[in-house]
Structures are given as C-alpha cells and as structure tokens.
Curated annotation (Swiss-Prot):
NCBIfam families (alphabetical): ccmA, PRK13538.1
Domain ABC transporter: 17-233
Organism, as annotated: Rhodospirillum rubrum (strain ATCC 11170 / ATH 1.1.1 / DSM 467 / LMG 4362 / NCIMB 8255 / S1)
Pfam family, one: ABC_tran
Main location (coarse class): membrane
Example of a GO MF term: ATP hydrolysis activity
The name this protein goes by in its record: Cytochrome c biogenesis ATP-binding export protein CcmA
C-alpha cells in the first residue's frame, strides 16, 4: 500500500493556487491567452488539447520555468513571481523527459531529490517500494529502460514531499500496473490536501478533476500582434 507523506510533511501548507488571464508567448507566437484557473487544496486540473495547444508550456509556466507575457499566478493570494525560490520548494515539475543522472545508481537518483527536500532515507525506501524499484536500486541510470526511468522519476513524488505536483505526460512508458500505482498515489496526495495538474494523452483516473481544454484559449491574433508591436516600440 502506498502511503505518501501527509500534509504535515509538506515544506509549506497547501493554499489556493490560481492563475488570472494568462498569456503565453513562445518566440513570436502566442500559444494561449486569457487562461484562468483556481486550484484549491485537494484539487486536480486535467489539461487536454491537441499537440501545440500549450499543455507543456502551461505546466512550465506554472513551475516558473517560463513567465507569462501577461496575467499572473498567485499562491494564497500572493504573487508567486515575488518569491520564485519559495514556489520552487512547494512544487514538483515532472516533465516528459526523465531527469535521471546516467552515472548515478537508481537509488542515488531518488535520494538526490529527497536530500533537496530535507527528507530522509525512509522516504527513499518508500518511494522505491511503491514503484517496484527496490530490486534495481544499485543499477546505474544509463542502464534503466524507458519505463524504469519514468518510474524512478515519479518516485521522487514520494521521496520529496511537495504540495503541488505538475505532471507532463506522466504515464509515458508505463504499463497499466504502474499507471494504477500513480493513480493511487495521486488520490492519496489529494486526500492529504495536495494538488495536481496533469497533462496526458492516455486514460488516467482523476475523480473530480477540473478539465482545462487548452484549445479553448487559442489566442486572438490581433492581441498577440499588438504585444509584439509594443515590444518593438
């Protein structure tokens, strides 16, 4: 049975995470505009849309790896841009590329995240057990299969507690059993007051999730053109 750390283990208590009238621009192309959301403790957002609609860009924006061209993000009513370090400590961004160091053993990779969060070896043990990785603990990252790397990357969700999970295509390379483990982990995280934003092309069970269809926020070309003219001026 998976038992992730409860809300008392979070570095910061969950609060309402919100975005208001967000505009995302990459290069000279507006990806989405006028996007707003409100995510309360225990909540989930499911991002849907065709390729190029901005699902990955939105997740990176929520992690402050990108900045909105307009609009703002708040945590508990306070602008997250005012303290990027604090926001980095309250969220896990798991991208579609696995952050596995090839020369480190699997356990060392997971322990790296636990150490950053101030968590101990018990968290690492639980993470490896949850994703059936304990037998592979001493295997170097470069020798892991795609599915094993993905499970190792997701194991940090248990090894390093954080209230906000931002998951980009988390089911990639996972078999049905591992997807079930992830679904259970997300459910327990939400029950403890945690929040999750998920982008996926595969079926994943997220009871009560708010669906955010990115193609509904396709930008008004005139608004994007106006932004570029202002920049040139």
């Amino acid at each position: 049975m998976i038992v992730p750390p409860d809300s008392a283990g979070f570095p910061e208590a969950p609060a309402i995470f919100a975005g208001e009238d967000l505009l995302c621009v990459r290069g000279e192309r507006a990806i989405f505009a006028g996007l707003s959301f409100r995510l309360a403790p225990g909540g989930a957002l499911l991002l849907l849309g065709p390729n190029g609609s901005g699902k990955s860009s939105l997740l990176r924006l929520l992690a402050l790896l990108l900045r909105p061209a307009a609009g703002r993000l708040t945590w508990g009513g306070q602008a997250v841009a005012a303290d990027p370090e604090a926001h980095g400590g309250r969220c896990h961004y798991v991208g579609h590329l696995d952050a596995i160091k090839p020369v480190l053993a699997l356990r060392e990779n997971v322990a790296f995240w636990a150490k950053l969060a101030g968590a101990g070896e018990t968290h690492v043990d639980r993470a490896l057990k949850a994703f059936a990785l304990a037998p592979l603990a001493t295997i170097p990252g470069r020798m892991l299969s795609a599915g094993q790397k993905r499970r190792a990357n997701l194991a940090r969700l248990i090894a390093a507690p954080a209230p906000l999970w931002l998951l980009d295509e988390p089911t990639t390379a996972l078999d049905r059993a591992s997807i079930g483990v992830l679904e259970d982990l997300i459910a327990r995280h939400r029950a403890a007051g945690g929040m999750v934003v998920v982008s996926t092309h595969q079926d994943i069970t997220l009871p009560g999730a708010t669906v955010l269809a990115l193609d509904h926020f396709a930008p008004d070309p005139s608004r994007a053109a106006g932004l570029f003219l202002e920049d040139e001026g």
